[in-house]
């Protein structure tokens, strides 16, 4: 029964896309969590419209991720999905993991090497593994993921290249496309880029980075995002959704 539950997250995302239901993930970076405030934070998450919790960061110790996920599983009913920065960020306590391949860059570590390292570990867990084409988009400032991965994001005005990259990911077998402006981005992913990609790929589109208010979430949805990720804005203001 447990395995059946754990293998439904991707299917739920597909069903939501089919039915026009928009999804929302709150991204928690364990490195930025103030543990004394965790209960209050989880209360706010439980009161929010969030449908998923993503956990991860560019540089996070695996033990910290384990501890946070354990707390989340105890105190929320939302699916907990690992958003890994490297192969050490794997915990069997989560429900699923985004199996990321950084398609916007040409660093082989983030295209395939870390995936090779992670595969044998993941095979020993019951985690639902969701293949995800990860595409960094220029956002007006250097973000942590660009710095750590030593890759350049795609030009935010080059819609053709962004679309071709997303389509390549789809053809390679990605189940999701994740358009990422980056944590603390000055500018979100361009709405026209979201629209062009969502109209020309069949798989669900995740959009994150640089979205600072509810209006920004709505605009991303209207452009074609199936799931929006909020991280820094919620970290900075746990009352983000109160308005």
UniProtKB/Swiss-Prot annotation:
List, separated by semicolons, the cofactors it needs. Mg(2+)
GO biological-process terms attached to the record: glycerophospholipid biosynthetic process
Q: Where does sn-glycerol 1-phosphate bind?
A: 178-184, 209-210, 231-232
What does the UniProt record report as the effect of altering residue 90 to A in this chain? Accepts HepPP as substrate
Pfam families annotated for this entry? PcrB
Enumerate the InterPro entries for this protein: GGGP/HepGP_synthase_sf, GGGP_HepGP_synthase, GGGP_synth, IGPS_HisA/HisF
Keyword list (alphabetical) reads: Lipid biosynthesis, Lipid metabolism, Magnesium, Metal-binding, Phospholipid biosynthesis, Phospholipid metabolism, Transferase
Which catalytic reaction applies to this protein? Answer: sn-glycerol 1-phosphate + (2E,6E,10E)-geranylgeranyl diphosphate = sn-3-O-(geranylgeranyl)glycerol 1-phosphate + diphosphate
Q: Where does Mg(2+) bind?
A: 29, 58
Question: Which GO terms of the molecular function aspect are on file?
Answer: imidazoleglycerol-phosphate synthase activity; magnesium ion binding; phosphoglycerol geranylgeranyltransferase activity
**Top EC category:** transferase
Give the enzyme's EC designation: 2.5.1.41
List, alphabetically, the GO terms of the cellular component aspect.
cytoplasm
Subunit info? Answer: Homodimer.
What PANTHER family does the database record attribute to this sequence? GERANYLGERANYLGLYCERYL PHOSPHATE SYNTHASE, IMIDAZOLE GLYCEROL PHOSPHATE SYNTHASE SUBUNIT HISF/H IGP SYNTHASE SUBUNIT HISF/H
Q: Which NCBIfam families match?
A: GGGP, GGGP-family, PRK04169.1-2
Family assignment?
Answer: Belongs to the GGGP/HepGP synthase family. Group II subfamily.
Functionally, this protein is described as follows: Prenyltransferase that catalyzes the transfer of the geranylgeranyl moiety of geranylgeranyl diphosphate (GGPP) to the C3 hydroxyl of sn-glycerol-1-phosphate (G1P).
Quote the HAMAP family the UniProt record gives.
GGGP_HepGP_synthase (MF_00112)
This one is known as Geranylgeranylglyceryl phosphate synthase
Q: What species was this sequence derived from? A: Flavobacterium johnsoniae (strain ATCC 17061 / DSM 2064 / JCM 8514 / BCRC 14874 / CCUG 350202 / NBRC 14942 / NCIMB 11054 / UW101)
